[in-house]
From Swiss-Prot:
<feature type="binding site">
    <location>
        <position position="174"/>
    </location>
    <ligand>
        <name>dCTP</name>
    </ligand>
</feature>
<feature type="site" description="Important for bifunctional activity">
    <location>
        <begin position="116"/>
        <end position="117"/>
    </location>
</feature>
<dbReference type="GO" id="GO:0033973">
    <property type="term" value="F:dCTP deaminase (dUMP-forming) activity"/>
</dbReference>
<feature type="active site" description="Proton donor/acceptor">
    <location>
        <position position="129"/>
    </location>
</feature>
<feature type="binding site">
    <location>
        <begin position="101"/>
        <end position="106"/>
    </location>
    <ligand>
        <name>dCTP</name>
    </ligand>
</feature>
<feature type="binding site">
    <location>
        <position position="162"/>
    </location>
    <ligand>
        <name>dCTP</name>
    </ligand>
</feature>
<feature type="binding site">
    <location>
        <position position="119"/>
    </location>
    <ligand>
        <name>dCTP</name>
    </ligand>
</feature>
<feature type="region of interest" description="Disordered">
    <location>
        <begin position="161"/>
        <end position="184"/>
    </location>
</feature>
<dbReference type="GO" id="GO:0008829">
    <property type="term" value="F:dCTP deaminase activity"/>
</dbReference>
<keyword id="KW-0546">Nucleotide metabolism</keyword>
<dbReference type="GO" id="GO:0006229">
    <property type="term" value="P:dUTP biosynthetic process"/>
</dbReference>
<dbReference type="InterPro" id="IPR033704">
    <property type="entry name" value="dUTPase_trimeric"/>
</dbReference>
<keyword id="KW-0378">Hydrolase</keyword>
<comment type="subunit">
    <text>Homotrimer.</text>
</comment>
<dbReference type="GO" id="GO:0006226">
    <property type="term" value="P:dUMP biosynthetic process"/>
</dbReference>
<comment type="similarity">
    <text>Belongs to the dCTP deaminase family.</text>
</comment>
<dbReference type="GO" id="GO:0000166">
    <property type="term" value="F:nucleotide binding"/>
</dbReference>
């Protein structure tokens, strides 16, 4: 079940959802808007000749910070990691989904590539996978609305929520845009036929 605005407010009041800072005017009919933080990560194209998700490539991205009143310029065809200003926490009874804002989509800005799903039990700043598919550079301002989160009630509480010992939760409690940690649980089936 997708939560409505009144359900989101009630879930927040009951402690099922926490966004810090919480701003009531960010609540939409069936979502809550989230804002862009000041931290970004860009690929360091000179450190490696390729990306391998099975390896720890610690120097693959480099973090940058802009001032609170300075924009980050995302150039055409560029990919950068960003993060939400809000620290998000959801309990084991809910899951969430991050979607882009349609007004930004109409400018060619994609908020995430594939990682829009947020597991029950997650807490931290949400890493954004920002892309500019337009033909012009776009200014991204700290504090601007960058996406919206919608919440889903689970049929029963998660037995092993994100952050529990059994889930291998590599991004729990993350601050700022967190680079890939795919090497920590890399899985590859042996294809024989």
């Amino acid at each position: 079940m997708l939560l409505s605005d009144r359900d989101i407010r009630a879930a927040h009041a009951e402690g099922h959802i926490s966004l810090d800072p919480w701003t009531d005017e960010m609540v939409q009919p069936a979502s809550i808007d989230v804002r862009l933080d000041r931290f970004f990560r860009l690929f360091n194209n000179h450190a490696y000749t390729y990306v391998d998700p099975a390896e720890n490539q610690g120097e693959l991205t480099e973090q940058f910070e802009v001032g609170p009143d300075e924009p980050w310029i995302l150039h055409p065809g560029e990919f950068a990691l960003g993060s939400t200003w809000e620290y998000v926490k959801i309990d084991e009874t809910l899951a969430a989904r991050l979607e882009g804002k349609s007004s930004l989509g109409r400018l060619g800005i994609l908020t995430h590539s594939t990682a829009g799903f947020i597991d029950p039990g997650f807490e931290g700043h949400i890493t954004l996978e920002l892309s500019n598919v337009s033909t012009l550079p776009v200014k991204l301002w700290p504090g601007m609305k960058i996406g919206q989160m919608c919440f889903f009630q689970l049929s029963s509480p998660s037995e092993h929520p994100y952050g529990s010992e059994t889930t291998g939760s590599h991004y729990q409690g993350q601050r700022g845009p967190t680079p890939s940690r795919s090497y920590q649980n890399f899985y590859r089936a042996q294809i024989t036929d």
